[in-house]
Curated annotation (Swiss-Prot):
GO terms for molecular function: haptoglobin binding; heme binding; hemoglobin alpha binding; metal ion binding; organic acid binding; oxygen binding; oxygen carrier activity; peroxidase activity. The modification N-acetylvaline is found at residue 1. Heme b binds at residues 63, 92. Belongs to the globin family. One of its GO terms (cellular component) is haptoglobin-hemoglobin complex. Residues 2-146 form the Globin domain. It comes from the Eukaryota. It comes from Leontocebus fuscicollis. Pfam families: Globin. The gene is HBB. The modification Phosphothreonine is found at residue 12. Involved in oxygen transport from the lung to the various peripheral tissues. This is Hemoglobin subunit beta. The modification Phosphoserine is found at residue 44.
Amino acid sequence: VHLTGEEKSAVTTLWGKVNVEEVGGEALGRLLVVYPWTQRFFESFGDLSSPDAVMGNPKVKAHGKKVLGAFSDGLAHLDNLKGTFAQLSELHCNKLHVDPENFRLLGNVLVCVLAHHFGKEFTPQVQAAYQKVVAGVANALAHKYH
């Protein structure tokens, strides 16, 4: 991902304020509610029968935290996203058979959640930088599919 110094600063400054557990759970939960076909990858998570069940599900929250932990690792290695996400790409491609389009959807949901949590602080410039990052991460996660 090519980010200007200003964009990198905007991304890392905001990320330093992110509650990974809260934002991760909300982002994954929203993905499962807004795009219900993604729930098929999480059948072992128990009750996903309603939006309230999804958003309150402890396994969704825990996995969301794990997902954002990996995203944090990516932010520390923006110049080598493919390398950083190589193992996760292989896992999601070969073992889990996740449609790579879901990575793009989750990235966009994450941007929405960040905007919701940070309001005016999530300026159009910050959003533009995050859109580049989530697109880069989605591309890196889809790498083993090509």
